[in-house]
Amino acid sequence: DDRGETWERLDGNGLPSGFGFALAIHPRDPDTAWVVPEEGAENRVTSDGRLGVYRTRDAGATWDVRPAYDEAWVAILREDGASDWLDPVGVYVGTQSGSIFVSPDEGETWVEAARHLPPVLSVEVAEWQ
């Protein structure tokens, strides 16, 4: 672990493509992350028309998919993923079609929390008291 000094390609190992955005990192476990793979830079739509959030718990060596929504030819931008600091960690993904998907349990299950918003260009999480 060199705090981002060096990088390696992580396509394969369970990911359907080597292109994707909406990367969210677990706030307490740097080996756990979530990403939404997309078909490529030109189309930027979810693989196979399904919104699947892929999770790694071993720093990208392997990935498993958690389906969030079927029949979702949606585009995700670079800053459209976030995680909170709760226990369990909540994970959030926004789409250019105006939906926000939320997982309250570290990516195990997903719900569409909002729809018909303007295009979501960025997702940030703040603690509300």
Task: Place the predicted regions along the sequence by residue.
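Extracellular glycan-interacting surfaces
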Residues: 1-129
